[in-house]
Amino acid sequence: MHNIVHPSAQIGNGTQIGHYTVIEADTFIGDGCVIGHHVVIHAGSKIGASVRIDDHAVIGKQPVSARRSKTTVAGRQLAPVVIGDNAIIGTGAIVYAGCRLGAGVLVADTASVREDVVVGDYTIIGRNATIENRVTIGTRCKIMTDAYICSFSEIGDDCFIAPCAATSNDNYAGRWKERTKFYKGVTVRSGGRIGVNATTLPGRVIEPDGMAAAGTVVTRDIPEGKVVCGNPGKVLRPVPSNQLLRNQEE
């Protein structure tokens, strides 16, 4: 069962590598990792100890820019990906170069994490979720199945983004050549939450412990500790005290 491991790659003690895996030049893989079958780890990738990378995952992919791309810089060679200790990368997941994943992060099956993204410790990126480029995500967040986080977004610590939640960064919906000056994704402060199938419009801010209920269209900033619902979203009530971040057990 043939693997291709470049002679310059450093493989830690006790690391297991599956069949038909490619590990390119100058890669570092820590001790006790488990690398599945048909995995591709691109040149220079830095992978910590006790990391699990499942079958068909791609680590350190350089982005491709279309002629009309507005947020991807053509020809820019990004720094190698860095993956912290005890992370898990699911089957078919893609983690781009220029990305930093903290310790204990889970990137679930078929999820995609683009370049220039930072993900804090113990955050979960759910199955088939998409994290576009130039995004910052804090620690202990949950970005659930099929959620879409657009470019230029900032998500604080202990945030929850429910399945199929969508964010946007272009108020001009692809029209007007000057629009790129005004791109801005969502900002979710620590403890903020977005419900199932909610849509957040460009530049909106969800303050700490703010909540967008399921199906909400967020057209205005959400105040701290308030639940917003409807289309357009309006304040419904305060977040119950037992759901506030400060009242949660570790």
Question: What is the predicted role of each segment?
Answer:
Residues P232-L244:
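C-terminal end-helix/capping segment
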Residues N247-E250:
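Phosphate-binding loop/pocket of nucleotide- and phosphate-handling active sites
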